Every structure is written in C-alpha cells, then in structure tokens.
Amino acid sequence: MATDLKTSFAGIELKNPIIASASPMTMSVEQCVQLEKAGVAAIVVKSIFEESVHYNANRLSDMQAHGEENYYLDGYIGEHMLTEWREQLRAIKSNCTIPVIASIAGVNLKTWERYAKAAVEEGADGLELNFMNVGIADRNTLFGTIERQFVE
C-alpha cells in the first residue's frame, strides 16, 4: 500500500511535500518537465531581480562612458528582462501540470506590484517574495531586520 504524502503549502494542494526551489534548474522548460517527471510536486521559477536590471544598465552605461543614457537603459533592460521572465513563466506553466510558483525580488513597492501582477497574469499558482538587501554592510544585522524594512 502506497503512503499518502499529499499536503498543502500556502493554500496550494500538493501530491507530496517536495518543491523545487528557485534555481538555474527552474528557469528551463525542459528541466521543469524533468523535475515533474521525477516526482517534484511544485516548482518555484527562477527569480526575477530588480537589482539585476540596475546592475546591467549601469554596466552598459559604463562601457559607453556616458551617464545620461543610464535612465533609459534601466527602463529598456527592465522591460526586456520582465518580458523574457514572463515568457519563460508562461512556457513552464503550459508544459507542466504541477503548481508553478513565481519568485520575485524588488527594491521598491512599484516594482513589487508590477512583478506580482505579471506573475498572476501568466498564471502563477503562487508567489514567493524574495526579500534581500545586497547593500548590507553590517554583518551583525539582526534576524528579521531586512524583512521589517520591506513591510514598513
């Protein structure tokens, strides 16, 4: 007799408690299909990071030795990255039958809202909010400090 491993996570019904976390493995449709075949009950799609947009725009701007286009590059790269992420999320959703959870990481409220809306529009079954702060200089930052900053 098989053991029933059904459970729920954040209100999502799962056939077992195994969830593939956001990683390079969960950004490929083929890998996600393989994970599902291997028995994974849900997939957290590779995160979209707002700070990656700023980093890439700054790198391009530095290479061209002009600062004024950085403003425009931020917007262009941001739209391009969001479009690619949405397409990937849509492809994973249409090729997998298990729940697909979108992982988003923003820096400001407007971006959080934009990314969350995009995930919902692409059919994500849930959202993982990736709270982090790459600018922490103090290694003694207390547990929960970063999270409280985002909530406030």
Task: Locate the predicted segments by residue.
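Active-site entrance/lid segments in N-terminal catalytic domains of soluble metabolic enzymes
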Residues: A2-E152
